[in-house]
Amino acid sequence: MANFKVVVSDPKEGRAYQIDVKDAEANALIGKSIGDVVDGAVFGLSGYKVKITGGCDGSGFVMKPDLLGPRRQRILMAVGVGYTPKHPGQRRRKMVRGKEVAPDIVQINAKVVEYGSKSIKALLGLEAPAEAPAEAPAE
């Protein structure tokens, strides 16, 4: 069974939330690609739509959006995801992973594209319950 750490970013709040996805929910993500919009109910965010933006595998190799399939491959890179050249025009062969989610992916990055009725904090149980105002001491 696959287990993923999904990092869901909320552009409105400027916050990111880490969610552990296991078993049946994780299997729903296998085969999806970078750029696919997924129902947020898979992560426990009912009513939300989430777009997959990237991720990495257990060895730390990043998912590259323009490499098809779930495989690892050494490609010649000049710029882009997974490589920053030190000098202009420098190219280097780097190991990257394809854009498809596979069972050996560890982390999936995503962002919210459609919001639900409840806040993400409330759905994940991070919102503190509202406290009743303290009564003034009687004199």
UniProtKB/Swiss-Prot annotation:
GO terms for cellular component: ribonucleoprotein complex; ribosome. PANTHER family: 40S RIBOSOMAL PROTEIN S6. The lineage of its organism: Archaea, Methanobacteriati, Methanobacteriota, Stenosarchaea group, Methanomicrobia. The gene is rps6e. One of its GO terms (molecular function) is structural constituent of ribosome. GO terms for biological process: translation. HAMAP family: Ribosomal_eS6. PROSITE patterns: RIBOSOMAL_S6E. Belongs to the eukaryotic ribosomal protein eS6 family. Keywords: Ribonucleoprotein, Ribosomal protein. This is Small ribosomal subunit protein eS6.
